[in-house]
A protein has these predicted regions:
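Short glycine-rich, Thr/Ser-proximal phosphate-binding strand/loop in the N-terminal lobe
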Residues: 1-33, 135-158
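Short, well-ordered alpha-helices that flank and scaffold nucleotide-derived cofactor binding pockets
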Residues: 30, 60, 64, 110, ...
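Conserved phosphate-binding catalytic cores of ATP/NTP-utilizing and phosphoryl-transfer enzymes
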Residues: 83-116
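A mobile "lid/hinge" subdomain adjacent to the ATP/sugar-phosphate binding pocket shared
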Residues: 155-172
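Conserved active-site and cofactor/substrate-binding residues in soluble primary-metabolism enzymes
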Residues: 19, 23-26, 49, 53, ...
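Extended, hydrophobic alpha-helical segments
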Residues: 53-55, 108, 165-170
Length: 172
């Protein structure tokens, strides 16, 4: 809306430190093609890894997958709390911010402008808020939906197995 860029495509895959760079390269290539893109369409990569053991493997996979017309790897930047995003990090310890929180906030500002709130329903549920001055005001982290459901099942054995999907009715 209003001339702002649109999110073209979004996909998530499970993080598995046992997978090789070749496995990630093939998986990412297939996912790109499934989304209607080619690795040749990629002109730069921002990697926001929250699994340090995977960062090198993913850099290797992406470096071999995403290459320019001359065959050289496209620019690849690993994002962290110290990466310049145009955001002011007004949190107690900016070094503790994970890459997914920083990239999510920066992407939300890029897509929707400010002020903006970001709610990420991943392994943890993360709420981040950016004000009109591009200041990341803070982050709230809680157990994710699957994590909470697994904990509930473990603590209350009589609760039946339910899938995480939209219910037909809010109560029932």
């Amino acid at each position: 809306p209003g001339g702002r860029p649109a999110l073209l495509w979004n996909v998530k895959i499970a993080a598995d430190p046992q997978r090789s760079a070749d496995e990630y390269r093939l998986t990412l290539g297939l996912l790109l093609r499934d989304g209607g893109y080619s690795p040749a369409d990629v002109d730069a990569v921002a990697l926001g890894s929250v699994v340090p053991a995977l960062t090198h493997t993913l850099r290797e996979a992406l470096g071999r997958l995403c290459r320019g017309s001359d065959g050289t790897p496209v620019p690849l930047r690993t994002v962290s709390a110290g990466t310049r995003t145009g955001l002011v990090l007004q949190v107690d310890d900016p070094a503790q911010l994970s890459a997914d929180i920083v990239t999510g906030a920066a992407a939300a500002v890029w897509l929707y402008g400010t002020p903006v709130a970001v709610l990420d329903f991943g392994t943890p549920t993360v709420l981040s808020c950016v004000d009109a001055n591009r200041t990341l005001l803070g982050v709230s982290i809680a157990p994710g939906m699957q994590t909470s459901l697994d904990g509930l099942r473990g603590a209350a054995a009589l609760i039946p197995h339910v899938e995480l999907r939209a219910p037909e009715s809010v109560l029932g």
